[in-house]
């Protein structure tokens, strides 16, 4: 005789294809505190009702498939299925909807961003019933976020390690990004750190190429930062990029960095992958290394308004996977970022509790409980004239990173670093005195330039530089 469960499944099974909305569209569902909630921007194919499209997203990203299967009877679909519980039209857009989906926590492996994304942003994005699909936001419940280590150290521990408080940190990406020998690269690192920067950075493209192997770069950069530390009395760092072709090689590079005694390493978390990133974050926590994260490849995923995934989701994923810094756009400069939206995900990186605020693109209230915060890094086409705006927009808990804005100084790398440090100190002092950086910013920089020839030269070089393109990332 067949087992009872098999008999029941066989008797109750009806083969064929049925509408997703019959099972996965549940507007009466009340979300649980333990559910992972998702807001999808859905563009259905012509003739597909929004309820069917939303239900299809819920089904294909959880327990559903294209036809009824008899093994459905061997489990409890009501316990494990995703549910589309609300749909709202997008204002000003034709045939576009925000579909809200709730996922039971048991669908996801603990501590695995990889597994979470494999379900939520997996095959469903190629589903034929949809013209386009974009994941706008996720609500990560404390019951799930507590299964992650998160950032190796966080903002307060980093400040304590560096002994630097009350101002943004200053950085610089070494340019040209490719082609320098290790010794010349180390020279540029020394000059920038000696001039007053807190950090210098490997470009995301720099791994271990024929013109500069990773071990040589690590050695010369370590020598440069220790020399600059001795001469300035300040703790310095260089983001040594440990990204590699295998996880084993990545960890080997991080181990070598720790043996050199440097304070920080770097990883390209999207091209390297979440599994590799989480492994590196755990190593950094265990061995006292800070972890700088670059977001190379993010625009492939997040730039299109109606398809892909918004960067705020990638930012939340990074906070769970682990990183002490992550690039976040600038609002000003050459790389894209609309102010309210950028500040929305900056808060999601730094703060413990973030209220729902649709004006800033935040679809759900997010409670990170005790997970450490991540410093946002403003980088890309910025220079001394941007310093007041950057200081006002990002506040103290940030890294302001000037690549060309340091190395492009007419007098050289060290004067470029001096110009940026003087501009930052002037802006912080003016802010602390109660001056309005947004309104008086240019005047504050001009006043400081009277006492700093390096800053005056920088102001003259970059006074006409503007990047006047409209941001695409708007609500």
From Swiss-Prot:
Query: Record's InterPro entries?
Result: RuBisCO, RuBisCo_large_chain_AS, RuBisCO_lsu_C, RuBisCO_lsu_C_sf, RuBisCO_lsu_fd_N, RuBisCO_lsu_N_sf, RuBisCO_lsuI
Positions bound to substrate: 123, 173, 177, 295, 327, 379
Subcellular location per the Swiss-Prot or TrEMBL entry: Plastid, Chloroplast
Catalytic activity annotation: 2 (2R)-3-phosphoglycerate + 2 H(+) = D-ribulose 1,5-bisphosphate + CO2 + H2O; D-ribulose 1,5-bisphosphate + O2 = 2-phosphoglycolate + (2R)-3-phosphoglycerate + 2 H(+)
Q: What is its main location?
A: plastid
Q: Name one GO cellular component term.
A: chloroplast
Co-factor: note: Binds 1 Mg(2+) ion per subunit.
Q: What Pfam families would the database entry show?
A: RuBisCO_large, RuBisCO_large_N
> What is this enzyme's EC?
4.1.1.39
Q: How is it modified after translation?
A: The disulfide bond which can form in the large chain dimeric partners within the hexadecamer appears to be associated with oxidative stress and protein turnover.
Q: Which GO terms describe its biological process?
A: photorespiration; reductive pentose-phosphate cycle
Family, per the entry? Belongs to the RuBisCO large chain family. Type I subfamily.
Indicate the quaternary assembly: Heterohexadecamer of 8 large chains and 8 small chains; disulfide-linked. The disulfide link is formed within the large subunit homodimers.
User: This chain belongs to which protein, by name?
Assistant: Ribulose bisphosphate carboxylase large chain
Source species: Piper cenocladum
């Amino acid at each position: 005789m067949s087992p009872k469960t098999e008999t029941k499944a066989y008797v109750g099974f009806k083969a064929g294809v049925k509408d997703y909305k019959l099972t996965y569209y549940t507007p009466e569902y009340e979300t649980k505190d333990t559910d992972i909630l998702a807001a999808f921007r859905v563009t259905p194919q012509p003739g597909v009702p929004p309820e069917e499209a939303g239900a299809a997203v819920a089904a294909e990203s959880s327990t559903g498939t294209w036809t009824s299967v008899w093994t459905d009877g061997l489990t409890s679909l009501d316990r494990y299925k995703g549910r589309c519980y609300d749909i709202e039209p997008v204002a000003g857009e034709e045939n576009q909807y925000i579909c809200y989906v709730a996922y039971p926590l048991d669908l996801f492996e603990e501590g695995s961003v990889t597994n979470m994304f494999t379900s939520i942003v997996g095959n469903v994005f190629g589903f034929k019933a949809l013209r386009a699909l974009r994941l706008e936001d996720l609500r990560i419940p404390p019951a799930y976020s507590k299964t992650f280590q998160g950032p190796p150290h966080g903002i307060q521990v980093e400040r304590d390690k560096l002994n630097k408080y009350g101002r943004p940190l200053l950085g610089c990406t070494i340019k040209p990004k490719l082609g320098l020998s290790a010794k010349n690269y180390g020279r540029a690192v020394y000059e920038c750190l000696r001039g007053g920067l807190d950090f210098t950075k490997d470009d995301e493209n720099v791994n271990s190429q024929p013109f500069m192997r990773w071990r040589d770069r690590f050695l010369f950069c370590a020598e440069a930062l220790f020399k600059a530390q001795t001469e300035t009395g300040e703790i310095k760092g260089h983001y040594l990029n440990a990204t590699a072709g295998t996880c084993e090689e990545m960890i080997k590079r991080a181990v070598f960095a720790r043996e050199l005694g440097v304070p920080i390493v770097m990883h390209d978390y999207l091209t390297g992958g979440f599994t590799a990133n989480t492994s590196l974050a755990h190593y950094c926590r265990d061995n006292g290394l800070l972890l700088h994260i670059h977001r190379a490849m993010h625009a492939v995923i997040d730039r299109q308004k109606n398809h892909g995934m918004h960067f705020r989701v990638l930012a939340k994923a990074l906070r769970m996977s682990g990183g002490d810094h992550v690039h976040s756009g600038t609002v000003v400069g050459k790389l894209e970022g609309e102010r309210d939206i950028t500040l929305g995900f900056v808060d999601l990186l730094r703060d413990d509790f973030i209220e729902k605020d649709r004006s800033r693109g935040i679809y759900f209230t997010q409670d990170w409980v005790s997970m450490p915060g991540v410093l946002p890094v403003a980088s890309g086409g910025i220079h001394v004239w941007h310093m007041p705006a950057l200081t006002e927009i990002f506040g103290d808990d940030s890294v302001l990173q000037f690549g060309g804005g340091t190395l492009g100084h007419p007098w050289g790398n060290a004067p470029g670093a001096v110009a940026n440090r003087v501009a930052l100190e002037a802006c912080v002092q003016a802010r602390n005195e109660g001056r309005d950086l947004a309104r008086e910013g240019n005047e504050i920089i001009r006043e400081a330039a009277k006492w700093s020839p390096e800053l005056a030269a920088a102001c003259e070089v970059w006074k006409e530089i503007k990047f006047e393109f409209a941001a695409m990332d708007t609500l």
